[in-house]
Amino acid sequence: MRVFLLCAYILLLMISQLRAVSFPEDDEPLNTVDYHYSRQYPVFRGRPSGNESQHRLDFQLMLKIRDTLYIAGRDQVYTVNLNEMPKTEVIPSKKLTWRSRQQDRENCAMKGKHKDECHNFIKVFVPRNDEMVFVCGTNAFNPMCRYYRLSTLEYDGEEISGLARCPFDARQTNVALFADGKLYSATVADFLASDAVIYRSMGDGSALRTIKYDSKWIKEPHFLHAIEYGNYVYFFFREIAVEHNNLGKAVYSRVARICKNDMGGSQRVLEKHWTSFLKARLNCSVPGDSFFYFDVLQSITDIIQINGIPTVVGVFTTQLNSIPGSAVCAFSMDDIEKVFKGRFKEQKTPDSVWTAVPEDKVPKPRPGCCAKHGLAEAYKTSIDFPDETLSFIKSHPLMDSAVPPIADEPWFTKTRVRYRLTAIAVDHSAGPYQNYTVIFVGSEAGVVLKVLAKTSPFSLNDSVLLEEIEAYNHAKCNAENEEDKKVISLQLDKNHHALYVAFSSCVIRIPLSRCERYGSCKKSCIASRDPYCGWLSQGSCGRVTPGMLAEGYEQDAEFGNTAHLGDCHEILPTSTTPDYKIFGGPTSGVRWEVQSGESNQMVHMNVLITCVFAAFVLGAFIAGVAVYCYRDMFVRKNRKIHKDAESAQSCTDSSGSFAKLNGLFDSPVKEYQQNIDSPKLYSNLLTSRKELPPNGDTKSMVMDHRGQPPELAALPTPESTPVLHQKTLQAMKSHSEKAHGHGASRKETPQFFPSSPPPHSPLSHGHIPSAIVLPNATHDYNTSFSNSNAHKAEKKLQNIDHPLTKSSSKRDHRRSVDSRNTLNDLLKHLNDPNSNPKAIMGDIQMAHQNLMLDPMGSMSEVPPKVPNREASLYSPPSTLPRNSPTKRVDVPTTPGVPMTSLGRQRGYHKNSSQRHSISAMPKNLNSPNGVLLSRQPSMNHGGYMPTPTGAKVDYIQGTPVSVHLQPSLSRQSSYTSNGTLPRTGLKRTPSLKPDVPPKPSFVPQTPSVRPLNKYTY
């Protein structure tokens, strides 16, 4: 239960974080008004239809004063009566014409300007009072201003200079307004547009301005709007961010304010300059761990009341070199005031970052306050402010904090399109109860978006894109380029339910709603969620107004719930060439589709995101549990398999190796199965030029025609050290023949010699260890432990001795049996204490001549060194030469008895009876090493015996092979033993050595015995 609650808590936390940092998606419009429908709307072009010779409008500004719309353009100002309902074209009622003089146009051309620029573009149109209007124009790059009467548009008074009141170029932005009888303007004050200024003129008092060429005050600004609120005048603009210069050139949106009663500074500081100028950043961004900013202010409204709060609403875009993106943000005037009461920002050195100024360093009275108000109430005018206050505000005009948007997020965003939003108009009292806020936003592509805004942070619904209107009329506006499609300004005429959309070459009048498009389909009317539309009692969809409350209507702008409504079966006529003569006809240009059953069912985005995320987490958890369980079962199964395999292999290897290594202590001869695989014999100690077979099987190997090297016979394996107990010759013969028959019949299976005991057979007490012949680096041989190599060796011998007959094979077999019989007789006589050594040597001489090995010199291959084996089986390296004969060691039979050191006895040959002989089985008797060592009685304790010079041809599986007598090592019993030799130790007898120069005659008579745990020589 605790785990479940913990998971639920984590899930809710992640959902809340996801909602907080998720980037808002673009909403699809509920309805779309395409060009075929919108081109019926009336258009104002500034010239009568058919008069194409007249210049285009060159729209500059648009202002609504009471029931008249003033449209200013190039050389002219038009008035439009809003009470008239135009049909296809908007006709101006009056026109003001103000053209530049010829001299001014010539001077403009002399300054290098194009003739199309050398005209009078009206940039300022500000009412001074109810009767007079202040008008300024560029006047061919020589700005001038005039007063006109509003009623008649007649010129009244004299021309005054437009410097610092009107820009020189029509492409430069500017704002102006009258407050308390004074003109506040913001523009550029020179021909090169390098001196940006916020300027106050006219009225009583001296003119004031911002500091010239001071980037801390303003830097390359674009002024957009100015409003009067309380004791201040607010300017909204965008500029190059001076606090961002160290990180690159970026544009920030600003709001600046000045006191209306500002009189400038003293003669020492800020004389004829603003003493109350402060500015702050407008922050329109998507919240999250890393904010996404819309920094470029494009347009902003006047102060409007939204939910009883004085608010300004602006449209912001991303940087010009960034991805296209736009947002609509609202700012409370209270939040703006709060920021101006906050901390200041400063840069201590030109290369340092901007930081906040501590409050204790802010002088009194607080900079930015208005004289006779608030903290500066004691001062009559700003001229009386202390120099410290004036100096501080001169160098610290920027506030540290930025103005946050209402609800800390944009009301609406548009980021999945290639165009940016450029203009805005807001109806803050839409709907029959005037409780909805509808935003109209223009764009660069000539598209107007109609948005039902989410104005409350506690609302369950986000903003909804109601309509997407393609407003630009290609046929009537005569666009010269794509820039002409940009919406420059929007003017709302709520009283006449119209929106005027201004382009550079025309102004189009668009109704605020298109309720007639839904006809008699109630479901479509309700699902539109348009505050201007409702289902009327007459059974049709129409526009609702506050005066229609008593008549009754049905509307659901909050949710658009149509679940209780049936489908619309009426299909409105579709016309590809609609009749646009009837304005607003219910069927003109409408393309309609039959509504499906639940097509208008809307699911809130937060609910959808929550459900999808919960399903994903649940699925991931289930999948993780399943994978974990399966993996755990699989790992356990593999461990069990590997454990069983290792146990079986360990048992097999250990038992087999034990049996093989204990082949020195073999029990009586038995016959065993031939299909049992033999484990690998010391594969880690001996190296070969051929790799072992993958299965590790070791089969019988046959000596090549040059003779099997004795090194392979050195391995202490049962095959190389047979033990033959005292038995009858007939019994031994039968066993040998039976073993030989099995070896000949099955060559591909592992072979066991009759002398080898089973892997787990107990050792016999009468067992006598045989001698071990160890490898020498001088011997050449070709060793292979693989079945394939043994098979190839056998085939090679058979191919070489191909002409031999079957009789030779039988003869070889008889000779092998005779050799075994001779060996048995020898052992029998050795165990007899009354036997005659000379008689025995006579028998040995006969058997000795039957088994001979090739000399070492006939070997052609170089054997690999086996240093590890020598180090492990011998004592530390001796001083014997590399070509010394084979070494031998005597292995004690009983582990519990301390081992004796092996004595090396050298001396001159005493007599021929001391000659050492070797008994070996033929190589075809399933021996992997090709050499078997025998046990022989010892006839003396030292001395060398001469190497016989005779050589004899022996047979290997019916093949005659010339072998020669080789020096060898053997274990020999002492004549002092009775019956079986005691298991306390063995004495070493001299080995057969090659002829070497004589050594000193002094040799020890008995070997020294040391209780060591390793063998020495």
Curated annotation (Swiss-Prot):
Residues 21-606 are extracellular. Disulfide bonds join 108-118, 136-145, 259-370, 284-329, 477-506, 515-533, 521-568, 525-541. Residues 628-1017 are cytoplasmic. Glycans are attached at residues 51, 283, 435, 461. Residues 1-20 form the signal peptide. It is a single-pass type I membrane protein. Its main location: membrane. Belongs to the semaphorin family. This is Semaphorin-6D. It comes from Pongo abelii.
